[in-house]
């Protein structure tokens, strides 16, 4: 089992699929990494040499923001919006949808479970 960017990569999957287990690397980025390193697309992780794993690791460290750093960066961006007091920051602070979705009937995921209203009993 190869360990890249602090994540255990599954050994029996193709490299492009296995790299997507790293937070911040999707299908396009995984394909790009494999092309840069020069590994055939159908190669599986358990067929990689130590040199190839090292090259993948170096490419990710050099060119991509992944895992904890990415999570921290996103959290800092949201915190910055909230500190600025802009509209998006206020929506984050209140736990409401940020991107203009309606809230009259929907947005239960963002708002949480429905709160009962007193005086609605028969």
From Swiss-Prot:
GO terms for molecular function: rRNA binding; structural constituent of ribosome; tRNA binding. One of its GO terms (biological process) is translation. InterPro entries: Rbsml_uS13_C, Ribosomal_uS13, Ribosomal_uS13-like_H2TH, Ribosomal_uS13_bac-type, Ribosomal_uS13_CS. GO terms for cellular component: cytosol; small ribosomal subunit. The keyword Oxidoreductase does not apply. Residues 95-122 are annotated as: Disordered. The keyword Ligase does not apply. PROSITE patterns: RIBOSOMAL_S13_1, RIBOSOMAL_S13_2. Keywords: Ribonucleoprotein, Ribosomal protein, RNA-binding, rRNA-binding, tRNA-binding. It holds the Pfam family Ribosomal_S13. Located at the top of the head of the 30S subunit, it contacts several helices of the 16S rRNA. In the 70S ribosome it contacts the 23S rRNA (bridge B1a) and protein L5 of the 50S subunit (bridge B1b), connecting the 2 subunits; these bridges are implicated in subunit movement. Contacts the tRNAs in the A and P-sites. Belongs to the universal ribosomal protein uS13 family. NCBIfam families: uS13_bact. Part of the 30S ribosomal subunit. Forms a loose heterodimer with protein S19. Forms two bridges to the 50S subunit in the 70S ribosome. This is Small ribosomal subunit protein uS13. The gene is rpsM.
